[in-house]
């Protein structure tokens, strides 16, 4: 957990306690809800906490806030504090600094936050929702100057101007109250739905999707989650929500976070240089321009989409004609690998946000105005079936919904859509532990689609539940074996195979299979199940490893840790001993050097992901120290060199230099002493002093690794310096640069001698 996540967890636990004590409802939402199910805590890269709260509960929380909020905490919402610049409320730490873009010229609290997305009751009549949505967009435009909201819904610019006129001449409070009276006029007991109070996209939910709440674990805290959790996650993220996205697709949120000061101190520093009036005027003109041009821009985007659609269809037709088999034949053969290849470009275009949209800020217009590529019903059916058979059920369902809206919807497409909805019903039954109903629902689906991975995985859950209870274990084994015949590289089924081996007492074989399973799945649920099963054995494993190292059984220790590093790559103790063991058993100097390079890269990567947070990278210290020792650095000097990797403060760096000087170092190790002092000086920015120490290290007749390191330093510096000198020479006189650069080496003769020694 990052430091930011620890702070957010503290804030959330405070809010959770207040809600439970005062019978206030909320549910975990968005990525936080995924974290509850997939990680039982934060998604590793998540940097916020989202909850939903019904409007009546939020209003009650506001009423009691004066007596229940801890020190340095506040509730923010625009209907209470008109200086607040967002449409949804927040629980904020006022003694911290986390400034979002919309707060740049505001006066509201800008600390670390919990987003509380209010759920406003909405009648069943869609016209009432459209009325709410229109006024919510205008409300958002007036509250938040940074973002243009209404253009995506083509809100008339005249409507915005009418309310802007009221805002300007009748006042902010009076105008916003008029809008609030319209938007919040519906009563909870009269409405079957909620709209999420967010200008970005006011999602609609059935009330029974959210309440009554259920309870699940989040970072060892029992939290409220939506009543139909699986339905919510499927609706919001698709059927593939449990899969961990590639690194580049992981979303985070932008905020200027400054440790050690409050948001007031930051604002006092930059606000005097900002022309607030000009920013507000520019913002208003940008909104007017965007709203006025929204329809034109959407028409242009539609025309661009049509051109791309035509070229994509032509490409698809060419691919189909080049295939040795027709689409119908490939479907009958269930050759979905070949079909997926044929449809690759079609999917890239048709499934993009620009064509079918997404229920998010950027994709909402296309979501309500999708563009379908004109292909035959046979082609469309084959494409949708391929999506189902390649674990993209959510995308297939979305496409089928869009196709149905066109009015041309053949029976096989209707059947496929109905079957996907049956599958989702079975998943919902399973969530509520109605196992028999879920299994009965799946039975006809398994007959019609015997090799759909998602369906096979779901059925395997029933069989494994029974096997864990000692019922029909043979049936489970046969089914998992058949599943692995169909999907030999799927870690989901490998994990079950390992579990069955473990039940039979074949633990060593099971661990090997678990390791393969870990490497062959990005399913977060499977990863979590492996973690929960294996983590209790991690501590005993590292103890065994240490015992093996103590008695000199290094190969046995390495074999043990290589396996467990595959099993628990994120377990800190396992990772620490894996690298320590590698440093202990390396047989060649090149292996130790390679290991050091690998560790340093990991440290740099982890620092880049969590700047300023060094908790996780501490686990590499022992391995680095052992590696330096293996390369000839005495114990204390090896520790100094390791500490240098983790140190950047000026006082700490000077202390490291003193430790290197004062260490009880044997005479033959003086080269290493000067080398380490040189490294410290270089990190301090004292280049000349650093190279003086490097030259002295070379004079001490250092041999082996230290001489290799020094040679690399000198030759690299000369190579890079010569390139810079050439640049200076082209621009004019390079003599000043050459004198400064080469001065640290001495005379030309000394430089020539140094090069000979390095080579």
Where are these regions (language model features)?
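Start-of-helix register in tetratricopeptide repeats
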Residues: 321, 378, 412, 420, ...
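Short coil turns that delineate tetratricopeptide repeat
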Residues: 351, 408, 450, 488, ...
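Residue-level recognition of tetratricopeptide repeat
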Residues: 328, 385, 427, 461, ...
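Register position in tetratricopeptide repeats
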Residues: 389, 431, 465-469, 503, ...
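Conserved catalytic core of two-metal-ion nucleotidyltransferases
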Residues: 1-22, 62-236, 243-301, 305, ...
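Active-site nucleotide-donor binding segment shared across nucleotidyl transfer reactions
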Residues: 16-49, 53, 58-59, 208
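Single-residue signature of alpha-solenoid repeat helices
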Residues: 339, 396, 438, 476, ...
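Canonical tetratricopeptide repeat
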Residues: 416, 424, 458, 496, ...
């Amino acid at each position: 957990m990052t430091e930011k996540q620890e702070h957010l967890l503290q804030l959330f636990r405070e809010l959770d306690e207040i809600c439970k004590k005062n019978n206030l409802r909320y549910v975990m939402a968005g990525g936080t809800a995924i974290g509850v199910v997939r990680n039982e805590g934060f998604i590793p890269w998540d940097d916020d906490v989202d909850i939903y709260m019904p409007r009546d509960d939020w209003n009650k929380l506001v009423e009691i806030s004066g007596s229940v909020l801890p020190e340095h905490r506040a509730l923010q919402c625009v209907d209470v504090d008109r200086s607040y610049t967002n449409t949804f409320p927040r629980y904020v730490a006022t003694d911290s600094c986390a400034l979002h873009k919309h707060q740049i010229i505001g006066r509201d609290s800008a600390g670390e936050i919990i987003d509380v997305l209010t759920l406003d009751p909405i009648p069943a009549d869609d016209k009432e929702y459209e009325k709410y949505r229109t006024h919510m967009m205008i409300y958002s435009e007036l509250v938040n100057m940074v973002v243009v909201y209404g253009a995506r819904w083509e809100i008339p610019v005249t409507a915005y101007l009418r309310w802007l006129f009221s805002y300007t001449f009748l006042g902010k409070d009076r105008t916003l109250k008029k809008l609030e009276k319209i938007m919040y006029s519906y009563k909870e007991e009269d409405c079957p739905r909620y709209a999420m109070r967010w200008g970005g996209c006011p999602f609609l939910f059935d009330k029974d999707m959210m309440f009554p709440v259920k309870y699940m674990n989040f970072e060892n805290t029992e939290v409220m989650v939506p009543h139909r959790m699986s339905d919510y996650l499927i609706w919001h993220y698709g059927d593939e929500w449990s899969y961990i996205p590639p690194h580049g697709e992981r979303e985070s949120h932008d905020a200027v976070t400054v440790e050690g000061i409050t948001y007031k101190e930051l604002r006092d520093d930059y606000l005097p240089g900002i022309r607030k009036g000009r920013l507000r005027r520019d913002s208003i003109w940008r909104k007017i321009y965007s709203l006025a041009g929204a329809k034109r821009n959407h028409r242009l985007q539609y025309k661009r989409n049509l051109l791309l659609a035509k070229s994509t269809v032509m490409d698809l037709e060419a691919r189909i004609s080049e295939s040795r088999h027709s689409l119908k034949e490939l479907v009958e053969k269930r050759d979905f690998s070949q079909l997926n290849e044929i449809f690759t470009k079609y999917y890239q275009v048709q499934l993009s946000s620009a064509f079918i949209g997404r229920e998010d800020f950027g994709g909402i217009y296309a979501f309500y105005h999708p563009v379908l590529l004109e292909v035959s019903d046979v082609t469309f059916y084959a494409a949708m079936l391929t999506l189902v058979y390649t674990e993209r059920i959510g995308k297939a369902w979305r496409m089928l919904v869009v196709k149905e809206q066109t009015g041309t919807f053949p029976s096989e497409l209707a059947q496929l859509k109905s079957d996907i909805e049956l599958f989702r019903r079975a998943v919902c039954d399973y969530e509520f532990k109605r196992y028999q109903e879920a299994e009965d629902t799946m039975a006809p689906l398994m007959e019609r689609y015997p090799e759909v991975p998602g369906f096979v995985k779901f059925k395997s859950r029933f069989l494994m539940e029974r096997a864990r209870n000692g019922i029909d274990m043979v049936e489970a084994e046969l089914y998992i074996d058949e599943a692995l015949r169909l999907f030999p590289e799927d870690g989901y089924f490998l994990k079950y195979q390992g579990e069955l081996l473990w039940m039979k007492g074949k633990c060593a074989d099971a661990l090997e299979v678990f390791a393969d399973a870990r490497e062959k799945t990005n399913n977060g649920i499977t990863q979590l199940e492996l973690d929960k099963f294996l983590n209790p054995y991690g501590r005993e494993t590292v103890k065994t490893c240490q015992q093996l190292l103590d008695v000199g059984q290094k190969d046995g220790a390495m074999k043990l840790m290589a396996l467990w590093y595959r099993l628990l790559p994120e377990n800190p103790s396992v990772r620490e001993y894996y690298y320590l063991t590698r440093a202990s058993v390396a047989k060649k100097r090149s292996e130790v050097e390679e290991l050091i390079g690998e560790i340093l890269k990991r440290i740099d990567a982890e620092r880049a992901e969590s700047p300023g947070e060094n908790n996780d990278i501490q686990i590499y210290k022992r391995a680095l120290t052992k590696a330096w020792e293996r390369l000839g650095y005495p114990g204390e000097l090896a520790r100094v060199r390791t500490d240098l990797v983790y140190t950047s403060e000026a006082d700490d760096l000077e202390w490291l230099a003193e430790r290197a000087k004062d260490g009880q170092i044997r005479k033959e190790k003086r080269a290493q002493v000067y080398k380490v002092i040189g490294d410290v000086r270089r990190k301090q920015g004292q280049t000349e002093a650093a190279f003086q120490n490097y030259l002295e290290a070379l004079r001490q007749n250092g041999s082996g690794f230290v001489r290799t390191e020094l040679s690399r330093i000198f030759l690299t510096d000369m190579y890079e310096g010569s390139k810079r000198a050439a640049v200076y020479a082209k621009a004019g006189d390079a003599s000043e640069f050459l004198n400064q650069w080469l001065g640290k080496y001495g005379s030309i003769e000394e430089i020539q001698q140094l090069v000979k020694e390095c080579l």
